[in-house]
Structure formats: structure tokens, C-alpha cells
Amino acid sequence: MNDTFDFIEGVKPKPKDHLEILPVSVMEIGPMGKQGVRGDTDHNKQSSRSGYSPFPYEIAETCAALFLRDAKLTVDPFAGWGERGDAMKRHNKEYRGFDLSPEAIENASKKYEVHNTLADSRTVDVPSHDGLLTCPPYWSLEKYAGDNGLDRCKEWETFISEYDHVLSRFASMAESGATYCIMTGDWRDDGTYYDLTFRTELIMHKLGFIPFDKVVVSRLGISKVKIMLPQAKRLGYTVKVHEMLTVFKKL
């Protein structure tokens, strides 16, 4: 009888509230190859900045299954390579992504059958929505196809102003109670610390959103910190091996 019971237990469908990724406030990201996007990444030879894309499966899955599970329409102003759209599609959620990079649009279509719109989120018609899932460009850390992206801004404050403009346009079309999931990172370059996470929080507060949850996105297990450790010790700061997913709610 125990064997029969075990067999039945083994074939039972997963409950509706089953989560593939454990919902904890620190999520360790597994290795991700970049074939078809930028080739393989060797973290022994490159800075940790190279690991900022593609978007982590664990985070996309958590947002789709947990934070945005009740959203009727989720938008994405920086749709990227298609990972977020793929997660929403797995959960049968309506998703509309916009991106300026023809390369990213093509990759999303071919690899994930996610059909994002080639458009500039600074000017595109934004639909009414109750969810947003995105990861903005990290200013000039990576250069994308196309000449008009935010990565082409020559000054940090110009980038922040353009980023603010995009979020403001989308927030103006967000329904009351809308959920916004935004992943950001901080970094150093030429002795300057760039605090994109904090700047995002300031923008969202101004737009009438409040924090709902935060998840530390840890890349410690896949980052080879030894290449950056000597400089960090010498200059007295930490090696950045994490990003932050911040979940906001519109009042």
C-alpha cells in the first residue's frame, strides 16, 4: 500500500501555488552561457560587469510566478534579449516588450519566440497596464546595436534624466496598485561609484510608488573575484557581486 501511495503522490499535478524558485530575499544565480547573444563569458578574464546580461532565469521566473502572478498586462520598456518575455509566456501572462536594439528583437524572436516591438520607450505609445518587468541598461557598461539608446548618453546625469523620462512615461499609464519589478546594479568606473539602484528608488518615489519587496541577486558563486580583489583591497572597497531586484507598488 505504501508503494501505491508513493506512486500516486509522485504523479500528482503540482499545486497551483507551486513555485519553481524558492522565494527568499537572497537568490544565488547559476551559470548562464551567452551563445547566440555575446558568446561565452570567461569571468577569469573579464570584469564582473560582463555578467549583467542576459537576464537571470531565476529572477524572471520569480517575477512571473510570484510578484506579477495577478497582472493582466505586463510591459517592459527595455525588453532586451527575451528572457523576461519568455518567463511571462511560460505562465500564460500577457507581456508587451519594447526595445531599440534590432539584435535583441531578433534574438528574442528566434530563441524564445517572444515578439517584442522595435521602438523607443521615450516616444512609444504606452498601453494601460498593471505590471512592469524590466532591467534598464547600465549606462555605458555595454554598447547595444543602434545609435539612440540610453547607453549612448555621454554623461551620467543625462542618462539618469532619460531613464527618469522613460519610467515617468510608463508610470503615467500604470493602474493604481500596479506592480513594478526593476532589476538594477551599482558599479565603479574610473574611481566613480554609480548608484543606479538608489537613483531608481528616488525616481519611483517621485512617481508615487512605494517599495513592496527587495531581492538581492547574488552572483558570488559564478563571479571570479580574484581578478578584482587586489584593486578592491588597495582602494578599500568591496567587489560588487550582486544586483538588486526592487518591487514597487503604485499608490
Please give the residue ranges for each predicted region:
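Class I S-adenosyl-L-methionine-dependent methyltransferase catalytic core
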Residues: 1-251
